[in-house]
């Protein structure tokens, strides 16, 4: 068929020419063909058939039409004639007659109509939607019902429209110096967005106000919108199958045979929403922004209906139009962000790989116009708009900072091992902390692992899908810290494969410009915290070996940032934020004490950065968290230490969590790694134990040295180190007793005095103060229980460290007992600590039945404290003492609780092993006793702590 005969097709099936023709089209479509109605060629054929079947009805439809409408009808007649070259109408006469018979027989039946569009929630969940706002499904599940996603359409754009668009763009460039009034009118006429009232767009004969959004803008806004879309087809005013003609006369432009790309029908962005996105305009200056990775000398940022300009880049006239046509360059700076993804596969003449959701996120425009509960999320909103609703993002941020106790801060999420940031700084309604999008995405990902939001629980697969997308987004936003391929070697699926390889096989490299003048100290700290979030969740999964890559990246970056050193003292002069002193709404914690001026970065390009006391404390807490996990994972995976005590001997110890969250920064604290229990948080009771564990790990590595280990084990130096570590454990035990006395006896005494005062002052009636006394008493009781729980956990881990100090970490070596250690005094002392650890585990189960207080850390200490009990049960069997039997029962209960809270393979495996041994202790010997012993040995052989063993990292 000829190209000339097809250039007028958009005129012939414009749905706004007549409302009656639309009704006839809807009635002529049978239910069996509804699914085909979205094809553009099928729409042409059905329109032609319906007009032929209508016959003389066309004459009556023309009554009362305006003059321009007659012109459209004449064009339609001409197009009908030109269609004969495309397909002979006589060949479809039997089909027309058959469909006419079907319409007559089904005239009495109700017309089946499909909804034009499902809401965003139903579309994402693949759920049937009734098309209402809000729809029934969103009402039932309490979801936010929105119709904010982009409209997409099938088929190619008309060559005539594309040529008109290119000509209009060129005309706009030449007429840019005209007065605003004349240019605005011409642009409005070209865009076609301002029609007379009698020609307003309708759908099925009804006026739809959604198409009239640009009419509500003021004059300047209309002009800015029209100038940004000059010569372009304003397709948000049309249904997906319609395109309006822009005029001819441009057939001579060099299109080189390209007929166009899929027009996605994206709505234009209202002007007020552009103002709400001002924080994205500087993304090209942020080296962490994914869009900054793209070459931007030929691209324009923004939005429009056309995905690409179709001019050949090699043509001489292609300089001004052979680039992305995503909006007006006057509204957005070049390459501010590429919010709308290109088609799945870019054309061959455009050298771009297929984008991944992480690097080219889709935008939901309506979400930015609503009020954001937590403004801290602004940097990440453009990236998560197509993943989760805005309200859910705020809820997930609440989940991240939720505490399981009202008396003392304790993270409820098992993947938040300690609070690095202040809750008030993140959730501040007006002046939140400035965060990188990667950190925010990782926080949402961590919270989504355990959130009970309906969006994540219905259907059951929703959580996995959302968490996977958030993980890909987080890794994509950290791309500057991950090695990319060499130029020219990028495959179309590299961005997607990078996510999988980043978790399992990917390498990491630190970009030095991230640590120099182009990056703030907060941004660099945010990157380390993002790695911590990723590593923590992966460590708790079955991919423990893969998590070491993320931990190594976090440790290396923390060392390069020198987080283990204190920054220089405050400088009293030069206060850049002094103008905020008179602001009553400013966050006082940001200004107290005065900030310091320090030099960050490397080399001569150092920059002066303002560091507040809060940012100093964030650096300290991040280092101490990495310090503790380094020692914890050294035990888990049988590896040497990475962060040394020498690197942080001058670093102040972290603050008390309650004071930290309240913004009460302490002026005096001790420096260096702690060895005494000081508080209820991980930094207060667990960090001192990890300091001692680091000494034990160094001692164990020296004992197992392949060349010097034997001489060291028999030397006096080894004995001296053992005695010193034992002394440190005794110091910790004493501090634990003082901690319990301070937070239980004093609180109980204070509560009793308060109750007595209330009883003496109000003997006959209950006052508000009397009613509040019950609340105070409950808070005191909760604080006492929380303190006892901390003491129980600390006691258990302390006993396990005594066992580890003896040097017997490997379960197979214990069962073999080649050195007859079971008959030594050291074994008797270690066995006493094993029973003490089991008794402490019983107290833990009393105060924390589901072991949810510290599930990420507790598993390995429960396991190492159980090996000696397993050895005793295996050797003594029915002759074991009652205390050993009770200890084995407690260990089995504790492992079952651990499996429920944070399910991991090694805990499930060891629970079966302990159950089998406990049955033998009770005298229930199976027939295949030897086979069961061999099976237990094979299972335990998976987890080795010998010289070449990898512990839990299978």
Curated annotation (Swiss-Prot):
InterPro entries linked: Transcription_factor_dom_fun, XlnR/Xlr1, Zn2-C6_fun-type_DNA-bd_sf, Zn2Cys6_DnaBD
Compositionally skewed regions (Low complexity) per UniProt: 8-21
Name used for this protein in its record: Xylanolytic transcriptional activator xlnR
SMART domains (UniProt xref): Fungal_trans, GAL4
GO function term, MF aspect, one: DNA binding
Statement: the UniProt record of this protein carries the keyword Cell cycle: no
Polar residues biased stretches: 22-33, 82-91, 174-183, 764-777
Role: Transcriptional activator of the xylanolytic system. Involved in the regulation of extracellular cellulolytic and xylanolytic genes and in the regulation of the intracellular activities of D-xylose catabolic genes in the pentose catabolic pathway (PCP) in response to the presence of D-xylose.
One Gene Ontology CC term in the entry: nucleus
Subcellular location: Nucleus
Major location category of this protein: nucleus
